[in-house]
Amino acid sequence: MKDGSIMVIGIAGGTGSGKTTLTEMLTERYGAKAYYEQSDNPYIGDFYNDMNRWSFNLQMYFLGSRIQQTMDILRSGPVDIFQDRTVYEDAYIFADNLHRMGLMSGRDFDTYMSIFGLITNLVPRPDLLIYLKASVPTLISQIRRRGRAYEMNIDEQYLRRLNDRYDDWIENIYRGEVLVIDKDREDFVADAAVMEKICARLDRKREELETAKK
């Protein structure tokens, strides 16, 4: 189990919201350890070409990799952790959205959520979740800028649906502590004040954890 004074921070947000960039910046600043979303999922290219056929395979692979990350975090040494996307997003955003769109069958979705529930009942939530909230135009701009081939044909309506799921999850489902960064107005790369805002919240969280441990 992790030391009680060590921060585990989840960084959440849609495709192109800047999760990986923020994870890198915070990891360097805090001398922390980063856990990144696996971009080499062997199903991801097939999924973007045929979502109905490959949705369950894609999500189960991500869930498996997230389970491994969680186990690694629980066994980690005395170092802060920043996690690029959380297991909760896999379920409440992506799997749920695919099911709502008719791209994942009810049977597959129920199987997925059953496994997800077993796992999340055994592991703690992040100490703080940083949600990078971004409009679809902002996401598309970022996606095009980074130029990943398998993302070039991503559907705008699909991104819009994901944003709706994110908003519902943050407002109505997630029970942990959340810091929302509005990526349309708050650029933590270009504006140092935004990064200082994030770090000030993290520093307060550290103080809370250290006080609770005493």
Predicted regions and their residues:
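Hydrophobic anchor at the beta1->P-loop junction of P-loop NTPases
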Residues: 11
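P-loop (Walker A) phosphate-binding loop of NTP-binding proteins
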Residues: 14
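ATP-binding Walker
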Residues: 17
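Walker A/P-loop
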Residues: 20
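Conserved substrate/cofactor phosphate-moiety recognition/catalytic segment
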Residues: 28-65
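Glycine-rich phosphate-binding loop used to anchor ATP phosphates in small-molecule kinases
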Residues: 54, 58-124
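A glycine- and Lys/Arg-enriched "phosphate-lid" helix/loop adjacent to the NTP-binding pocket
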Residues: 92-165
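NTP-dependent small-molecule kinase module
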Residues: 140-214
